[in-house]
A protein has these predicted regions:
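Short, surface-exposed "cap/lid" segments of acyl-processing enzymes
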Residues: 32, 39-97
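Primarily recognizes the serine-hydrolase "nucleophile elbow" in alpha/beta-hydrolase
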Residues: 134-182
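N-terminal cap/lid segment of alpha/beta-hydrolase-fold proteins
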Residues: 9-40
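Alpha/beta-hydrolase active-site loop
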Residues: 103-131
């Protein structure tokens, strides 16, 4: 039984172990990254890399969280329903890393999508790929993790596809919608250059999502028409992505050849 005093980071680690994932750490650029993985030595050409949601940057409207690590794993659960080689790539300052050198609350609030966050995650992933040279990388991110996955794509040469789920790809529109603090210092995908034509992007969104409504994703797609937006009826921000993930992942990957 999980101790009631366990931190979110400890809880997340315990959940990863329960799901059967091995764990490790990778050095990025100035930050340490917790990773979880499975089937890494299996013969396959593609590696699926998962990025988790923003977790709990704030407690209420004014208090910054001491530990932003997600209380409810979501991308981790998606990864558990995938069956090929797969890697969960942790963010800087999450998953017991919040006390590392270079970490401050800004790294999980205003600067959660900052250039140094993306650069460090890309460096950590490249360090992993140097030891496990997969020719194709598929980046998969849920909610704010989808935003980071998209930002990572052009910085990881092995990337062939990005799949985002309920991702706030127009962060300015998203913060305005919810009256959140501006993401000063963060990158905003809607204002970034298009991905290389060699990288496909499927952007899933639920038609009942009130956190990241379809208008946010379509606002992004208006500036990035190369993105294939797929709106799923009756889905919201959490239902029912995990249950339908194998089917949705297969559909997203199949769309690359169409």
């Amino acid at each position: 039984m999980l101790c009631a005093c366990a931190t979110p980071s400890q809880h997340f680690s315990d959940e990863a172990k329960t799901l059967g994932f091995a764990s490790g750490n990778l050095d990025g650029e100035g930050f340490r990254h917790v990773v979880y993985f499975a089937q890494i030595d299996r013969a396959a050409d593609a590696l699926h890399v998962y990025v988790e949601h923003d977790g709990t940057p704030w407690i209420g409207v004014a208090r910054v969280s001491d530990d932003p690590t997600p209380r409810t794993p979501f991308a981790l659960e998606l990864m558990a329903r995938d069956h090929g080689p797969r890697l969960f790539l942790g963010r800087p300052c999450y998953f017991e890393g919040r006390r590392d050198s270079g970490c401050s609350a800004r790294m999980w609030t205003q600067r959660r999508y900052a250039p140094e966050v993306v650069a460090s995650m890309a460096a950590a992933l490249q360090a992993f790929l140097a030891k496990h040279p997969y020719g194709n990388v598929v980046l998969i991110g849920y909610s704010g993790g989808g935003t980071l996955a998209w930002l990572l794509a052009s910085r990881v040469p092995q990337t062939t596809a990005v799949v985002t789920i309920a991702a706030n790809l127009d962060t300015q529109a998203w913060t305005t919608l919810h009256d959140y603090s501006p993401m000063n210092g963060s990158l905003d995908p809607v204002r970034e250059p298009a991905l290389p034509k060699s990288i496909s992007h499927v952007a899933y969104v639920g038609d009942r999502d009130t956190n990241v409504p379809p208008t946010i994703v379509r606002s992004f797609a208006a500036n990035h028409p190369e993105a294939k937006v797929i709106e799923i009826a009756t889905f919201d921000h959490t239902c029912c992505w995990i249950e339908r993930w194998p089917e949705l992942l297969n559909a997203a990957l199949a769309s690359r050849s169409r």
